[in-house]
Amino acid sequence: MPNLLEKTRKITSILQHSVDSLETELPYNTMASRLADIIDCNACIINGGGTLLGYAMKYKTNTDRVEEFFEAKQFPDTYVKAASRVYDTEANLSVENELTIFPVESKDTYPGGLTTIAPIYGGGMRLGSLIIWRNDNEFSDDDLILVEISSTVVGIQLLNLQTENLEDTIRKQTAVNMAINTLSYSEMKAVAAILGELDGNEGRLTASVIADRIGITRSVIVNALRKLESAGIIESRSLGMKGTYLKVINEGIFAKLKEF
């Protein structure tokens, strides 16, 4: 059986595995699964708003009603508010406690059910909660040490990812601003008309048709597209007689055009 040191190493090794995006569905499922295996429990990770980021069920404990929370990837507001008031790890909470993960209707089925909640912090901010639970068997001191380490590891992962996402957003906004600043009034008018032709973020357009409709030359449209493409705002591909295929890869351009 792995000792505390071996389990700790397994948890800290999670930092070597990156989470690509918080936008993906349940980005922390793999992490929750690894934590559940190491600590031998069910586990879930939620953010500050109660959105489910990942979970792992080693043991059946929930009713259909609670399973719906996991399927919807959102915990009830009342539970989220109660969890947000946990500032230090609360261990071995009984099924009678308001923070129990066990539903009211299953208290008789799992009278020995125990829940442990650990707040997740990063950069001095509350980022979410790590919740683990068992049908019975208290979480030992060794288990709770692993929980503290786990919440720290998850906090580092979340903070790093949020920082990366923020940096990416800033880069995209900067690219849009720089591209917009190179456009003349006529080119801005052309860009607004072009993007208005798209079906969502991509589509086919004919430059000459747009030019005639808004009263500018085709060369203005061509120049505007070239500037946007060189700035990494769009991708384009000639379709010959059918026109040009266009795809927006930096959606910040849409918000910027609303200011035009």
UniProtKB/Swiss-Prot annotation:
Transmembrane segments: none annotated. One of its GO terms (molecular function) is GTP binding. It comes from the Bacteria. It comes from Streptococcus pyogenes serotype M3 (strain SSI-1). One of its GO terms (cellular component) is cytoplasm. The gene is codY. Belongs to the CodY family. DNA-binding global transcriptional regulator which is involved in the adaptive response to starvation and acts by directly or indirectly controlling the expression of numerous genes in response to nutrient availability. During rapid exponential growth, CodY is highly active and represses genes whose products allow adaptation to nutrient depletion. Residues 1-159 are annotated as: GAF domain. The keyword Signal does not apply. CDD domains: HTH_ARSR. InterPro entries: ArsR-like_HTH, CodY, GAF-like_dom_sf, GTP_trans_reg_CodY_C, Transc_reg_CodY_N, WH-like_DNA-bd_sf, WH_DNA-bd_sf. Residues 207-226 bind DNA. Keywords: Cytoplasm, DNA-binding, Repressor, Transcription, Transcription regulation. It is found in: Cytoplasm. Pfam families: CodY, HTH_CodY. This is Global transcriptional regulator CodY. GO terms for biological process: negative regulation of DNA-templated transcription.
